[in-house]
Amino acid sequence: MRNLILVGPMGAGKSTIGRLLAKELRLLFKDSDKEIELRCGANIPWIFDKEGEPGFRDREQAMIAELCALDGVVLATGGGAVMREANRQALHQGGRVIYLHASVEQQVGRTARDRNRPLLRTANPEATLRTLLETRDPLYREIADLVVETDERPPRMVVIDILERLQQLPPR
């Protein structure tokens, strides 16, 4: 197995499920946002404030290219990673892509108290999440080998579902 790459909106459970999946498969877990923070010595909101979203996306693109070149990694990506064609290509070529789908209602509940999400610093975070999902959902689906629903499911059950469904995929 090369890599397992988790894509999906914020609040879908990419980091939580990614850690569990990596532990189960005895693989290394990487979170592209956390890796950017470690490399920069600053958190994502600070990078957004100082460099804007384009500056952050440039850093993200470089990090995704680097992480997708590894072998034996479970990679959790940021929700907007799929917005750039270069990222979609790197993710698709980097391993099996798993789209963790979550409804806007679930995303709202899971992100409500998280201050580390610059795109949700709006008057109406739910409307923002809805707009983001409408824009990004087709891009997640474009590169996904699997689409896995996370609504109302404990992370452990999602991991079991992923493992079972991965075995059914034909080699590529």
From Swiss-Prot:
Task: Tell me where it resides.
Answer: Cytoplasm
Keywords from UniProt, A to Z, are:
Amino-acid biosynthesis, Aromatic amino acid biosynthesis, ATP-binding, Cytoplasm, Kinase, Magnesium, Metal-binding, Nucleotide-binding, Transferase
Instruction: Identify the coding gene.
Output: aroK
Positions of ATP binding: G11, A12, G13, K14, S15, T16, R117, R153
Record protein name field: Shikimate kinase
Q: Which residues form the signal peptide?
A: none
General function of this protein = Catalyzes the specific phosphorylation of the 3-hydroxyl group of shikimic acid using ATP as a cosubstrate.
A Gene Ontology BP annotation from the UniProt entry: chorismate biosynthetic process
